[in-house]
Amino acid sequence: MSLLRFAILCIIFVSLFGVHECFRGEKINVPAHPCYHTLCGSMIRNCYCCLGKKFDYCSPNQQNCLFRCEEVNRIPDFPKTNGVSKGLGPPIYLFFLGQFIYFVLGL
């Protein structure tokens, strides 16, 4: 196998890792504690502020912050696809990869 064919094969396998990770869209990295401790000002020394997409929420009580943060920044059960399909499933793209390797690269 020539060096060029090996390099093309490595690029294909590395790019397939990214495609494989796209199929796992339901796994979203959320911090274990979405509320971080900070100093709010002179009146309230200890605050817990929410890390979220929708708005910043701060509370002197950590439990209130956790409850409100999870309520507002809830992750939907079914991720929105905006009308776009997930694409080809893993068995199909592996089939096409095999065909590509066989016919184009001649391996």
Swiss-Prot record:
| Keywords of the record | Disulfide bond, Membrane, Signal, Transmembrane, Transmembrane helix
Q: Where are the transmembrane segments?
A: 87-107
Subcellular compartments: Membrane
Which cysteines form disulfides?
35-49, 40-69, 47-65, 50-58
Tissues expressing the protein = Expressed in flowers.
- What broad class describes the main subcellular location of this protein? membrane
Q: List the membrane topology term(s).
A: Single-pass membrane protein
Signal peptide residue numbers: 1-22
Q: Which GO terms describe its cellular component?
A: membrane
Q: Which family does it belong to?
A: Belongs to the MEG family.
The protein in question is named EMBRYO SURROUNDING FACTOR 1-like protein 5
Q: Give the species this sequence originates from.
A: Arabidopsis thaliana
Q: What is the lineage of its organism?
A: Eukaryota, Viridiplantae, Streptophyta, Embryophyta, Tracheophyta
